[in-house]
Amino acid sequence: DYYENFYEDPDEIGASYHAFIYDLNTDKSGNFYFSQSGYKSPLTGGVVKVSPDGKSAEFIGTDLRNPNGMGIGGPKDWITVADNPSGKAVYNGFFLAKKGAYYGYQKSRTVPMLVRLPASVDSSSGSQCWSHTEKWGPLSGSVIHTSYSQCSAFYCFIQDIQPYPNGFAVRFPFNLDSGAMRPRVHPIDNQLYITCHKGWDTTAPLDGVIYRFRYTQEPVVGICDAAVTHSGLRLTFASDLESSSVKTSALKAYKKDDSKKGPEPLAYKLGKVQLINSTTIEINILDIEKESLLNRTDENGNISVNAPICLEYKLKSKNGSTIEQTIYATVNSLPEEKTKD
């Protein structure tokens, strides 16, 4: 074997057990990326970009505490990163890494969460990756997100609109035996592989597991796309829906903000639920415009983190299957209204 050290970080790593260098990714141009801890460490917490020849490096976003995972992919070669905001995080998920951005550890946040999850669902995130654009059935092109703490994996949809995209996450119905950390799509079989680990702050019973998530060609009935509308949410499913099951009583929407103590989650008032076509429904959520980024940004550009809309639904597909899932919707932007000629 041949090993070559073509880049060496000039910063001291430090003796703290939190002074980690995390993950390793490349973009389409061959640049390397990794994240590093800023907690109990002499390092600057951030995402580091290294040139293909290893001769230069720069930060792509700083002010990160303990960014265990990141990812690169999608049609725009987006860089995602997941931080752990505290030892007992009140939320988690992931956001986009951008040069010059701050993420709320020691400074005010200037970039919102792309996907936020309640701590009961994910309190310590791993990495992300993009599923194959064609070889993964109805979930092709979705973003895969991992939870180290809750031993779970999620498939996510991104609505790429201005000023900042909206994100939607659905948990795979599998309880993993170890903390999910590093997802990758195999270049030969195009299926998803996740390496898992057990350390502190995880529900994992086992130390070290590798999983394969594969598309079996069997019919899929669950959700396969989502979007924010001016009046609520639009959900698209992978199979035809039984129209009689599409009704308000089959859905429950609430905001679960684990950063605030309270007896019950804040319930959303649902309006009309419409069947747009055989696979798509639109749910009217009153005052959804209050969730937008414009209402969470102060005059200095600082952004508050908003709890996701948790939407539970129990529907029927025309083949008789029950579709019972929860989608976590992170609303940042509303689409532009169409003007009439």
Functional labels for PLM-detected ranges:
Residues D1-R234, S243, K272-L275, T279:
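Beta-propeller domains with acidic blade repeats across secreted/periplasmic ectodomains
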Residues G38, D160, K198, S239-L241, ...:
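A mature extracytoplasmic/lumenal domain signature
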Residues G137, D240-K247, E289-L294, N302-V305:
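A short beta-turn/strand-edge loop motif at beta-sheet boundaries
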Residues R182-P183, E282-L286, R296-E299:
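Exposed aromatic-hydrophobic patches
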Residues Q217-G222, C310-D341:
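Acidic, Ser/Thr/Gly/Pro-rich low-complexity segments and short DxT(G/T)-type signature motifs
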Residues R234-Q274, L311-N319, T326-A329:
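Short, surface-exposed alpha-helix to beta-strand junction/turn motifs within ectodomains of secreted
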Residues N277-I283, E289-K290:
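Aromatic sugar-binding surface patches on proteins
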Residues N295-N302, I309, L315:
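Cytosolic C-terminal regulatory domains/tails of membrane transporters and channels
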